[in-house]
Amino acid sequence: MQIVASLTDPSQAATAQSQGADLLELRFDLMEGDPVDIARRCRAISKLPLIATFRSALEGGRYFGSPEEWAKKIAPVLPLVDYVDIEQQFARKSGLVREAGKAIIASHHTAEMLPLHVLFVLEQELRAYGDIPKIIVTPHNEDELIDLIAFTRAAKKPVCTGVMGSAFRYARAILPLFGSELAYCHAGVPAAEGQYSVAEFVALMKMLS
């Protein structure tokens, strides 16, 4: 399991590293300024691997562009990052990321909970173009959360699972115990509702281990 610090400002990189993050996610859709300059600033502050993300409005972010526009935005930052988050709607542009030798986090975020059989199909679809499938859903009751835990345990690895919102915030700490590869946290300002800070998550893992 690796801790990802989702940054909403490049100045948070130092805090994330000092608190114990393993990777830094650059949420370009939440940042002001040129993505290349932002990535360079983070490289100057920290040597941790970087994830480039333009989270679409459809999946909880603030990016509204087409796949073609997404490709134009991601191309200049490829020399500076190690991973690229690619939603399914942008999957046909994954070739340029592969050609650059970067790893792909193939992601899907939904405000609903998906049935178990759909989760397994989705995992295969994401793995078809990505190295790490990332599936973030929204359980509405404990039974649905148990299904998500069961999927996480049974799915092919590596896989990343998580929850949207704060209703089942504690699942963010539980899912890595059942095999989720990445745990997304914040380093000052949450990039998503319900995120723990890196420091909080490190403390939780120590208590649960």
UniProtKB/Swiss-Prot annotation:
Keywords: Amino-acid biosynthesis, Aromatic amino acid biosynthesis, Lyase, Schiff base
Catalytic residues in the record: H109 (proton donor/acceptor), K134 (schiff-base intermediate with substrate)
Similarity section: Belongs to the type-I 3-dehydroquinase family.
Presence of the UniProt keyword Lyase in the record: yes
Pfam families (alphabetical): DHquinase_I (PF01487)
Quaternary structure note: Homodimer.
Listed Gene3D superfamilies: Aldolase class I
Physiological role: Involved in the third step of the chorismate pathway, which leads to the biosynthesis of aromatic amino acids. Catalyzes the cis-dehydration of 3-dehydroquinate (DHQ) and introduces the first double bond of the aromatic ring to yield 3-dehydroshikimate.
GO biological process, one term: amino acid biosynthetic process
Residues where 3-dehydroquinate binds: S6, E25, L26, R27, R55, R172, Q195
Transmembrane segments: none
Protein name: 3-dehydroquinate dehydratase
GO molecular function, one term: 3-dehydroquinate dehydratase activity
Enzyme Commission number, as recorded: 4.2.1.10
The protein's annotated pathway: Metabolic intermediate biosynthesis; chorismate biosynthesis; chorismate from D-erythrose 4-phosphate and phosphoenolpyruvate: step 3/7
Keyword Glycoprotein included in the entry's annotation: no
